[in-house]
Amino acid sequence: MSKVHVFDHPLIQHKLSYIRDARTGTKEFRELVDEVGMLMAYEVTRDLELQDVEIQTPVTKMTAKRLAGKKLAIVPILRAGLGMTDGVLSLVPAARVGHIGLYRDPETLEAVEYFAKMPQDIDERQIIVVDPMLATGASAIEAISSLKKRGAKSIRFMCLIAAPEGVEKMQEAHPDVDIYIAALDEKLNDKAYITPGLGDAGDRLFGTK
């Protein structure tokens, strides 16, 4: 069964309070999501494999540590996932970036893929799928299934807030994928919105309705 990591770091919780606040404008909301994405990425990448390299400092030669082999790929779920991508990239600027777009079928309510563009060596990289919200879990489950079909073997999912219902469905569908969240909220309401939540992350990021 996948592990659920809930971050209680004071800086993350402080910034998340402003992200949730309905009075927070688009510019500040976007900046805060970016910042929290960076802070979360620090912990998500904590156990990346390192290798020894020989370097020359201004004083002497030494053995240092660098990331081993192929490194990271960040895959935002369009469009809200874009808001977290730059924050992760500020920490690991050499990471490759894929994109996956999904929409909800109005009849079946299932997530349907309409766009996907991935690095060619996706099977050799540690994948971090990013999306601000894990509500029903449908989009995240479909995105991860799509990545696995393309050969991805090592995947993690990172979001700002999640509902227990979405976490449960993710664990059932992908028990090998660890979930990293800034807050686990109470529930989904009758419109499948996370409660208390933060509203529609995409609309708040891009100033749309």
From Swiss-Prot:
Stated name of the protein: Uracil phosphoribosyltransferase
Swiss-Prot/TrEMBL catalytic activity: UMP + diphosphate = 5-phospho-alpha-D-ribose 1-diphosphate + uracil
Cofactor binding remark: Binds 1 Mg(2+) ion per subunit. The magnesium is bound as Mg-PRPP.
Cofactor(s) this protein cannot do without: Mg(2+)
Organism encoding this protein: Staphylococcus epidermidis (strain ATCC 35984 / DSM 28319 / BCRC 17069 / CCUG 31568 / BM 3577 / RP62A)
Keywords: Allosteric enzyme, Glycosyltransferase, GTP-binding, Magnesium, Nucleotide-binding, Transferase
Pathway: Pyrimidine metabolism; UMP biosynthesis via salvage pathway; UMP from uracil: step 1/1
Biological process (GO), any one: uracil salvage
EC number: 2.4.2.9
Documented activity regulation: Allosterically activated by GTP.
InterPro entries per record: PRibTrfase_dom, PRTase-like, Upp_B, UPRTase/APRTase, Ura_phspho_trans
Annotated SUPFAM superfamilies: PRTase-like
